[in-house]
């Protein structure tokens, strides 16, 4: 339930551009391909085609994370809202257009405002005005920034009881463990004393279930993975996409899926003025997705200054939504 705010949509939307470094795909790819284990930066998956492909992935029967997390929120969002409490400021790391964000905002008790943080200004502006139209009684602040870096965020004009961040989608699993702990530590500083974080995590489970989710029978994930090579070709590379295949094994010891592009033949590729040789069967790593035991994630959160106070899971314990609160002791 949200209190009425008589200001117009335009008056309730604030756009703050921190001018994030958008990166140089060619330079970052060149650096990654020079390493002993060749890799490419996963942030370049998401051009317009990549975003559409990922949306299609979330609808696949094998891909359980999205629908499982949404099911948890459908069942428990009012308990989540009670844990957050009334008159909170919600900070979402993302553009805020998803169903999960709307479900949470619908359940929150008179939130003072929502702060969206995303690197794409165009996506932010569009979603900020959509949210302001939907919630005609709440201030929306859109911050164009890289949320993986240290930030100081603007606050809504109305006083807030606490600040709570929202990070759904098991996106935290794309970080290495040290990176995840560093990110959680920055979030703890961002939300401050009394603050919290509602975060989705993908749980450890049967290896076949995990691998099927990232190696779907229709080949949509393969197209998504190969799209990064197409993007590089737009920037002066010469990858032949037909000479690569997608594979995403689960690495048991590391507890993560590893997205790979495997060279089908011995070949040489060019990125800008740099050339790289690949042996037949050699792979390029494009993304990691860590799966957690709940106790493991609790230890990581504690290392970052949080304590796990509540969590909600599906009946099979495939996925959990965790509520962390800043440990003020």
Residue positions per predicted region:
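Substrate-binding/catalytic lobe of Class I Rossmann-like enzymes that use SAM or dcSAM, i.e.
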Residues: 209-294, 298-304
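Conserved SAM/SAH-binding beta-strand->alpha-helix loop
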Residues: 117-122
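Class I SAM-dependent methyltransferase Rossmann-like catalytic core
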Residues: 37-84
């Amino acid at each position: 339930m949200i209190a009425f705010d008589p200001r117009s949509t335009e008056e309730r939307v604030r756009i703050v551009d921190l001018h994030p470094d958008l990166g140089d795909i060619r330079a970052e790819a060149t650096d990654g391909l020079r390493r002993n284990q060749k890799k490419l930066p996963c942030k370049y998956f998401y051009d317009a085609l990549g975003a559409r492909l990922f949306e299609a992935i979330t609808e696949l029967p094998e891909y359980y994370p999205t629908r499982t997390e949404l099911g948890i929120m459908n069942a428990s969002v009012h308990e989540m809202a009670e844990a957050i409490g009334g008159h909170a400021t919600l900070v979402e790391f993302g553009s805020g257009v998803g169903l999960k964000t709307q479900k949470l905002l619908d359940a929150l008790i008179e939130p003072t405002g929502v702060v969206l943080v995303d690197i794409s200004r165009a996506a932010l502006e569009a979603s900020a005005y959509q949210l302001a139209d939907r919630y005609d009684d709440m201030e929306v602040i859109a911050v164009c920034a890289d949320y993986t870096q240290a930030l100081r965020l603007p606050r809504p004009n109305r006083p807030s009881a606490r600040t709570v961040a929202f990070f759904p989608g098991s996106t935290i699993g794309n970080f290495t463990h040290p990176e995840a702990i560093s990110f959680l530590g920055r979030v703890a500083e961002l939300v401050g004393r009394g603050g919290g974080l509602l975060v989705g995590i993908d749980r450890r489970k049967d290896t076949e279930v995990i691998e099927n989710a990232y190696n779907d029978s229709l080949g949509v994930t393969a197209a998504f993975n190969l799209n990064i090579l197409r993007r590089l070709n737009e920037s002066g590379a010469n990858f032949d996409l037909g000479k690569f295949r997608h594979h995403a094994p689960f690495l048991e010891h590391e507890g993560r899926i590893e997205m790979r592009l495997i060279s089908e033949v011995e070949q040489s590729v060019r990125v800008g003025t740099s050339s790289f040789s690949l042996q037949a069967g050699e792979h390029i790593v494009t993304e990691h997705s860590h799966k957690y035991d709940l106790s493991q994630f609790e230890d990581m959160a504690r290392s970052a200054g949080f304590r796990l106070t509540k969590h909600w899971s599906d009946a099979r314990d495939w996925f959990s939504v965790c509520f962390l609160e800043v440990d003020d002791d």
